[in-house]
Amino acid sequence: YLSVKDLLILNEKPTVSLKSGINEVIIEISEKRLGVTAVTENSRIVGIITDGDLRRMLTKSEDFSKLSAEDIMSKSPRTININAMAIEAMELMESNKISQLLVEDNEQYAGVIHLHDLIKEGII
């Protein structure tokens, strides 16, 4: 049985800080190609920003360029422990209608697991 750790792409760990500007957020999401970035403080997850959040913010905010990660992020994102089973990740994604989960290891940000990872490994 595969664990989240087995699927985690350790070198793809998109992250920004609370004060990161919108340009940095967009670059991080684009370069890591997962459609998401964690917002961290002292290696702990404090929020998440998805490409969908960015699109919604474009329609709401008049001065988009002055926004920081803290202004855009969703607080209390869904997370999963690095030692959880991959099937648990799938169930969490299905029940919350999401395609990415932030992964924690001893309450520290460890990376992202994506629905595509589960599909690729035949979990779904």
Predicted feature residues:
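Nucleotide-binding motor/catalytic cores of P-loop/tubulin-like NTPases across gene-expression machines
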Residues: 47, 51-53, 62, 66-69
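Glycine-rich acetyl-CoA-binding "A-motif" of GNAT/NAT acetyltransferases
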Residues: 45-48, 109-112
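Bateman (tandem CBS) regulatory domains
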Residues: 1-13, 66-77
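Conserved active-site beta-strand-loop modules that form the wall/rim of enzyme catalytic pockets
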Residues: 34-37, 46-47
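The conserved cystathionine-beta-synthase
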Residues: 15-33, 40, 58, 79-99, ...
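Phosphate-coordinating loops and pocket residues in cytosolic domains that bind phosphorylated ligands
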Residues: 9, 59-60, 74, 120
